[in-house]
């Protein structure tokens, strides 16, 4: 599987940070291809203007239709006319791990990173297939959300992570938060590693980890528990967690 992503952005240099770590490894392995189109390169006036004042007044500037439309046209000429366009915006649907797993199979994709007060709505109506948000807060532009989506998808590519089970055991993969992790030394001050992790009993370790995942999710993200149908075993483990924590 290869992931092919195009990005429409005024600041392609921001994505240089992706050349390190997991994404850098995927790029070197040719498991991931990133291409960039800067709307400023498609502005037709001498000043290469990409924004203008909003109709109706108000603060800030709005990204213009034409430079974005031409940048998208160039991107689709390379990636394919039917390539889906995803706009990263606080007004979009909340991005989840389930959506990430779905999007990795929709490659190639074009990610549209807005700036300023936003993008002319007519561009969104004409060119955008989906809008996604990484949370209920405001950033300076869509570049960081685009990087978040790229990172989340890249982790799911087979062979990119160091261990074949790393992605399958991440938080949210099973709809739960991750369990606690420990490494050497065995004891730090008065805080020892839970004895079950030293037992060598893999069944007991798996049971403990699931119990911790269930308990942590209940404590921190009850919405995830409530939308999940717990099995009898999971409910029993969650009850044990409550008893042990009381």
Curated annotation (Swiss-Prot):
Location in the cell: Cytoplasm
GO biological-process terms attached to the record: tRNA N1-guanine methylation
Record bears the keyword Cytoplasm: yes
Molecular function per GO: tRNA (guanine(37)-N1)-methyltransferase activity
EC code: 2.1.1.228
One protein family per Pfam: tRNA_m1G_MT
Binding site for S-adenosyl-L-methionine: 114, 134-139
PANTHER family in the cross-refs: TRNA (GUANINE-N(1)-)-METHYLTRANSFERASE (PTHR46417:SF1)
Function recorded in the entry: Specifically methylates guanosine-37 in various tRNAs.
Name of protein: tRNA (guanine-N(1)-)-methyltransferase
Organism: Coxiella burnetii (strain CbuG_Q212)
């Amino acid at each position: 599987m290869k992931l092919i992503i195009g990005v429409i952005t005024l600041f392609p240099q921001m994505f240089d940070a992706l050349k390190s770590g997991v994404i850098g490894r995927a790029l070197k392995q040719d498991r991931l291809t990133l291409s960039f189109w800067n709307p400023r390169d498609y502005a037709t006036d001498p000043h290469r203007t990409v924004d203008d004042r909003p109709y109706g007044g108000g603060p800030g500037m709005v990204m213009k239709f034409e430079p974005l439309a031409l940048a998208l046209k160039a991107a689709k000429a390379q990636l394919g006319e039917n390539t889906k366009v995803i706009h990263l915006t606080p007004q979009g649907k909340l991005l989840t791990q389930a959506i990430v797993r779905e999007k990795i199979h929709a490659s190639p994709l074009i990610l549209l990173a807005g700036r300023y007060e936003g993008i002319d709505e007519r561009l969104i109506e004409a060119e955008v297939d989906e809008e996604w948000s990484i949370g209920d807060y405001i950033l300076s532009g869509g570049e960081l959300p685009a990087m978040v989506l790229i990172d989340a998808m890249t982790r799911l590519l087979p062979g990119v992570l160091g261990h074949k089970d790393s992605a399958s055991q991440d938080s949210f993969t099973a709809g739960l938060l991750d369990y606690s992790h420990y490494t050497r030394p065995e004891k730090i001050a008065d805080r020892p590693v839970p004895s079950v992790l030293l037992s060598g009993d893999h069944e007991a370790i798996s049971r403990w980890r699931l119990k911790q995942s269930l308990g942590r999710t209940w404590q921190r993200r009850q919405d995830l528990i409530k939308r999940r149908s717990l099995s009898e075993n999971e409910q029993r483990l969650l009850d044990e967690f409550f008893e042990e924590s009381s």
